[in-house]
Amino acid sequence: MSWTASVFLRTSTTSMKFLRLRWPLPRIPQNKSANVAPRFRSKSAVSQLSSGFKFVQIRKSTCDSNEMTIKAIKARQIYDSRGNPTVEVDLTTELGLFRAAVPSGASTGVHEALELRDNDKANYHGKSVLKAVGHVNDTLGPELIKANLDVVDQASIDNFMIKLDGTENKSKFGANAILGVSLAVAKAGAAKKGVPLYKHIADLAGNKEIILPVPAFNVINGGSHAGNKLAMQEFMILPTGATSFTEAMKMGSEVYHHLKNVIKAKFGLDATAVGDEGGFAPNIQSNKEALNLISDAIAKAGYTGKIEIGMDVAASEFYKDGQYDLDFKNEKSDKSQWLPADKLANLYQEFIKDFPIVSIEDPFDQDHWEAWSNLTGCTDIQIVGDDLTVTNPKRIATAVEKKACNCLLLKVNQIGTVTESIAAHLLAKKNGWGTMVSHRSGETEDSFIGDLVVGLSTGQIKTGAPCRSERLAKYNQILRIEEEIGAGVKFAGKSFRKPQ
């Protein structure tokens, strides 16, 4: 019997609903719980991050027991959904072991926190993460253990690691090293409090009302996520007409399978291969054709008017010499066909007119501020900043000032800690933006962002198609949360941009 298994056997239950949500997290020992969740005395405080950004959060929740500190931290190299190395962290407290894995992106913004790779071309094409693993095992772990901080105090632990790193973009230890520890700390903090992870996150963010999100299913993949000719990266369906998350999943799944049949009938079985995020990757070049295929599938499923469409253009991937190359995967693309920003904006306006599009992400290059502001100013739909904002408070503040977009794409590995991710969301919300929680194209089985989107109640999440286990891990976690909360739980639906 393993040490971890023996820990589980020695502990007693707190709440079967909690265990269904968080299994196999350790249960609270009898001398701590008496089979009921403990009561907490919470202090609200303003936390100052090293980045200079302030936000109000539940700084510390103290039980009737002593503080629970970290006993051990162990990092290792595992593999993500693309077969590339990534970081996994095990954190041990008196309650047992808490595990977190870090995702990785393909189309990454130049302003993201640094993902530390070994750059040894003889191993994994330079993508191994043994340096980041070493930083956790040799520095971050030992220093955190010596600091003796309570795992419930997420902000203090995250800020401790930020200061220890000492760089603006976490380039000393790597955001992937720091994030692995931060995620594991959040899970340990939830267990110490005897609550599901989403409730702990809600406490950290000061969120009083739980609202389940609309899923944005990426059903056609292009750009850097697929080996086809399609330039624009993601074509998504949003079941905004659903009345529950369960119904939204049903609608998404049915449209996904209708789409497979539509693509198969038009292009043959070979065209139904899937991309990195589980969406189909037919070898088409016309972005409008992708939208037509999705519209046909929605109609065949009987959900016209109940399902809307979103796009992630990832335009930074095909921005060349001040123009946009929609044939960028062709090394011999015709430069005369490249589009200036105003022509590309006109194309988006045509899409919005012809299709039920409610959201466009990264329509222009990450530093093409004027083009962003012009489009956001002349449309009522959601314009999402991903590469533009990279979950970074400084970039968000600039985007707010320039009125460049109206929604933040929240990716925890872009900024590197749970605390800073929450801060980014709160800053966006304060300025009237929406927030869409997001996965990365290189994912793991870790379902953390499923709890994150519920805890923050942002109203929308994108984590791929209803296909591939690393994508379904997040959607399935939200289904479990919906079941645990029970009747009366709110679903964002048509109000996904500003859930209430």
From Swiss-Prot:
Which top-level enzyme class is recorded in the Swiss-Prot or TrEMBL entry?
lyase
For this protein, the record's SUPFAM superfamilies field holds: Enolase C-terminal domain-like (SSF51604), Enolase N-terminal domain-like (SSF54826)
The pathway that the record names for this protein is: Carbohydrate degradation; glycolysis; pyruvate from D-glyceraldehyde 3-phosphate: step 4/5
The record's annotation in InterPro entries points to: Enolase (IPR000941), Enolase-like_C_sf (IPR036849), Enolase-like_N (IPR029017), Enolase_C (IPR020810), Enolase_CS (IPR020809), Enolase_N (IPR020811)
Q: Does the keyword Cell cycle apply?
A: no
- State where the protein is found: Cytoplasm
MF terms in GO: magnesium ion binding; phosphopyruvate hydratase activity
The GO biological-process annotations, alphabetized, read as:
canonical glycolysis; gluconeogenesis; glucose homeostasis; glycolytic process
State whether keyword Protein transport applies: no
Report the protein's function: Enzyme of the glycolytic pathway. Glycolysis is essential in glial cells but not in neurons; neurons rely on the citric acid cycle for their energy needs, and on lactate and alanine secreted into the hemolymph by glial cells to fuel it.
**Family affiliation:** Belongs to the enolase family.
What is the protein's given name?
Enolase
The record lists the lineage as: Eukaryota, Metazoa, Ecdysozoa, Arthropoda, Hexapoda
The encoding gene: Eno
